[in-house]
Amino acid sequence: MYALLLRVMFLVPPERIHHLAFAAMRVAARFAPTRALVRRLAVVDDPILHSTVFGVPFRAPLGLAAGFDKNAEGVDVWGPFGWGFAEIGTVTAQAQPGNPAPRLFRLPADRALINRMGFNNHGAARAAEQLRARTATVPIGANIGKTKVVEPAGAAADYATSAALLGPLADFVVVNVSSPNTPGLRDLQAVESLRPLLRTVLETVADGGRRVPVLVKIAPDLSDEDIDAVADLAVELGLAGIVATNTTIRRDGLHTDPEDVAAMGAGGLSGAPVADRSLEVLRRLYRRVGDRLALISVGGIETPEQAYQRVLAGASLLQGYTGFIYGGPFWTRKIHRGLAELLRRDGYTSLTEAVGAEHRGPRPQADTA
């Protein structure tokens, strides 16, 4: 059924259908009868999936990745639609229009998207207003980025402005230095640039008077050495975790016609083609930091089996966006139900018990004698 609907929706320009679908979801979540129906169809409340990560309780591990709800307009939508949490943004200190359209493209043959949105959003002050009014029952993270017109020398102060506005209202803050669509942003992933930026954000959030976990989001295109350096820095500074990974600028291995891909132009590629590298980065990070940091894995997750693989590889939480687009409004139910079944199949009593299990070797078999 959804496959047919998806074909119809794909007749509409991607950004337009995004706004229409998002509006429909907000309407469904606004009224008690439709909200109750959606919740019954989407929510999986299974104790085996409950966990506490960086001091925040999560009733389910799959969250909505940043990029869908840029302005925190749907914070009360995501719980009823089965998400364990959601990340708003990316939000910048100043409102900005983003890059010129067209800036969002579909690659159905690859179950992927290319975007060069450019952090289009209404600004941190507007997002803060939305967060103040929320009644959300799931954790909400605030993903913050650099305002495009701000020079690199002013990046730390720019991030601090967003952190000061959103930190007191969010359950966690994610520092995004990995989008390929803001010129020079990825240069901030270099440790010598990242250290003062993260310190400033940490100090700003601490000044807000409540403990708010701070994470950093990294790109899949970093070298292994740079991944290690960021991981070491995160531990050094006392970050709560790392979100891995953002979109990639690579285009190799795609099934979509190369001429069509070239015509789409620059931007970050998300979806199935990112899965292998995202898993690779996750494994490297866990080997580096173990349980000293929480790892949120995002990139190419489509099935319960892939979700389970990420947990075993070291992910305490998961995120999706492109999988949601191709999987439909109740995709979260499929992932959560399947993940719970896989955990029980292998003898785990909780999600937390399974995090990073592949790095600890085979599980001992129960004595049946």
Curated annotation (Swiss-Prot):
Classification via PANTHER family = DIHYDROOROTATE DEHYDROGENASE (QUINONE), MITOCHONDRIAL, DIHYDROOROTATE DEHYDROGENASE (QUINONE), MITOCHONDRIAL-RELATED
- Membrane topology listed for this record: Peripheral membrane protein
Entry keyword annotation includes Protein biosynthesis: no
What species was this sequence derived from? Nocardia farcinica (strain IFM 10152)
Q: Name one GO biological process term.
A: 'de novo' UMP biosynthetic process
Per the record, the similarity remark reads: Belongs to the dihydroorotate dehydrogenase family. Type 2 subfamily.
Name of the protein in question: Dihydroorotate dehydrogenase (quinone)
Pathway(s) of this molecule: Pyrimidine metabolism; UMP biosynthesis via de novo pathway; orotate from (S)-dihydroorotate (quinone route): step 1/1
Q: Per its Swiss-Prot or TrEMBL entry, what cofactor is needed? A: FMN
Biological function: Catalyzes the conversion of dihydroorotate to orotate with quinone as electron acceptor.
Q: Which residues bind FMN?
A: A66, G67, F68, D69, K70, T90, N143, N176, K217, T245, G271, G300, Y321, T322
What cellular-component terms does GO give this entry?
cytoplasm; plasma membrane
User: Which residues bind substrate per the record?
Assistant: K70, N115, R116, M117, G118, F119, N176, N181, N246, T247
Catalysis: reaction(s): (S)-dihydroorotate + a quinone = orotate + a quinol
Question: Which InterPro entries does this chain map to?
Answer: Aldolase_TIM, DHO_dehydrogenase, Dihydroorotate_DH_2, Dihydroorotate_DH_cat, Dihydroorotate_DH_CS
- List the molecular function annotations (GO) for this entry: dihydroorotate dehydrogenase (quinone) activity
Q: Which UniProt keywords apply?
A: Cell membrane, Flavoprotein, FMN, Membrane, Oxidoreductase, Pyrimidine biosynthesis
Positions of the catalytic residues: S179
- Corresponding gene? pyrD
At the top of the EC hierarchy, this enzyme's class is oxidoreductase
Q: Where in the cell is it found?
A: Cell membrane
User: Which SUPFAM superfamilies has this protein been placed in?
Assistant: FMN-linked oxidoreductases
- Report the EC number(s), separated by commas if there are several: 1.3.5.2
The record's subunit annotation is: Monomer.
One Pfam family matching this protein: DHO_dh
The free-text note explaining how the cofactor binds reads: Binds 1 FMN per subunit.
